[in-house]
Amino acid sequence: LTIKVGGSPIKVRIPAGIKDGQKVRVKGHGKPGTHGGPTGDLEVAVTVKPHPVYSREGNDLVMDLPVTVSEAILGAVVDVPMVDGNTATVKVPAGSSSGTEIRVRGGGVTTSKATGDLIARVAIRVPEKPGRELKKLAKEMAQAEGDLDVRATLAEAAQE
């Protein structure tokens, strides 16, 4: 990265894996020293632009992994895009709910000290305008679920 300070271009090396708000020091490019002392260092505050797919938690990258209702119920093998442009094939376990985490080891941010993982969080997606066949299948599924109450303990847990 090249920045201009006082009209002069200065090269700044941004290390891999730098976090938002961290500072990079450029030795000898700060203000002149007093009484003939050495020139000070320039500190550059880094702002990391948010990514449309990935967010960062420590050295881990986190993303939503859209899956269909049938993939969540039955399980599926899907490709996940990696930040380096490659893909990783992962298994969505049968019975996954939204929020289920699938970890790809070594798919996160690499720093001088460690490499994080990519965490793909299952995000069940339903069609905005389901067709007649999907509605019919959903009604059959509702009947098959019988008395299943997925919110049975919600009110009690909310009071704790």
Residue ranges, per PLM feature:
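Non-catalytic interaction modules of co-chaperones and other macromolecular assembly/maintenance factors
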Residues: 1-160
